[in-house]
């Protein structure tokens, strides 16, 4: 009997494989993206200290509106870039979380780039 492929399990394996070579430092922290069916979350993480430096999500009161999911991802990208700039962070390492660079993940990344983050 053929079993159905669990997309999230494959994504988690891909993310673990990529994370072996990808880490953030204090000078160049990691921008991590998590995508659920309804919301999108972004964190800027210093892996040396194990500390989250900034975060934004589509659940935040200033972002949450009745917009499409791609539009919300764009707003989250702009918000995380603004919070990073407030903390003095200009360069980051982009961690797409095992997701394809398409749709909401791409919209978040491009909005963060346009708002001043370099990666």
UniProtKB/Swiss-Prot annotation:
> Carries keyword Ribonucleoprotein?
yes
Q: Which SUPFAM superfamilies match?
A: Translational machinery components
Query: What domain of life is recorded for the organism?
Result: Bacteria
Supply the alphabetized keyword list.
Ribonucleoprotein, Ribosomal protein, RNA-binding, rRNA-binding
Single annotated GO MF? 5S rRNA binding
The signal peptide stretch is: none
Gene Ontology BP annotations: translation
A Pfam family it matches: Ribosomal_L18p
- Cellular component per GO, a single term: cytosolic large ribosomal subunit
Which HAMAP family does this entry report, sorted A to Z?
A: Ribosomal_uL18_B
What assembly does the database describe for this protein?
Part of the 50S ribosomal subunit; part of the 5S rRNA/L5/L18/L25 subcomplex. Contacts the 5S and 23S rRNAs.
* Role this protein plays: This is one of the proteins that bind and probably mediate the attachment of the 5S RNA into the large ribosomal subunit, where it forms part of the central protuberance.
Give the family this protein belongs to, as stated in its UniProt record.
Answer: Belongs to the universal ribosomal protein uL18 family.
The record ties this protein, via NCBIfam families, to: L18_bact
Protein name per the record: Large ribosomal subunit protein uL18
Q: Which organism is it from?
A: Staphylococcus aureus (strain NCTC 8325 / PS 47)
